Amino acid sequence: MEKILSKVWISNGDSINQYVCIWDTGSMETIVSDKVISDLNPDKHGYVYINTIHKEKKSDKYILQLSLEGHSQSIKINPACFGKSREFDVIIGMDIIQHGLFILDKGKFSFTIDQLK
């Protein structure tokens, strides 16, 4: 099965950078890579334990804003960090997907969202 990749913009309130994200309906929360944390140096806001394919690990959580490709509204997120960057730096999880219409039809992907609070 093909990976569903798209662009996102992440901001710490002062700077904004573009990243590649993967859409993952198996992930409960949106998480970011070490690269995002290194680039933006966001404020820490708690911690969480995350499960990876290797083990459970403790990760700081951060305060960031995310903008999805094709959407003008930014979304406040409190992501943990999944570690080393791969071909993507953001994993979009069900905390965002559940608020919109997620369509995958014959390899074409679309996501629309009205409003997140």
Language model segments and positions:
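Pepsin/retropepsin-fold aspartyl endopeptidases
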Residues: M1-K117
